[in-house]
From Swiss-Prot:
Database matches in InterPro entries: Snake_toxin-like_sf
Keywords: Acetylcholine receptor inhibiting toxin, Disulfide bond, Ion channel impairing toxin, Neurotoxin, Postsynaptic neurotoxin, Secreted, Toxin
Protein known as: Nicotinic acetylcholine receptor-binding protein Mnn-3C
Keyword flag Secreted: yes
GO cellular component assignments: extracellular region
Recorded superkingdom: Eukaryota
Annotated localization: Secreted
Signal peptide segment: none
Organism: Micrurus nigrocinctus (Central American coral snake)
Family (UniProt): Belongs to the three-finger toxin family. Short-chain subfamily.
Cysteines engaged in disulfide bonds, as pairs: 3-24
């Protein structure tokens, strides 16, 4: 399970899903 961390520059993958600007996805 990975997440998409949204930045102004673009998207970056992350394994952690803390509450905030991160959107979790089951598959990536």
């Amino acid at each position: 399970k990975k997440c998409l961390t949204k930045y102004s520059a673009g998207l970056q993958t992350s394994q952690t899903c803390p509450a905030g600007q991160k959107i979790c996805f089951k598959k990536w």
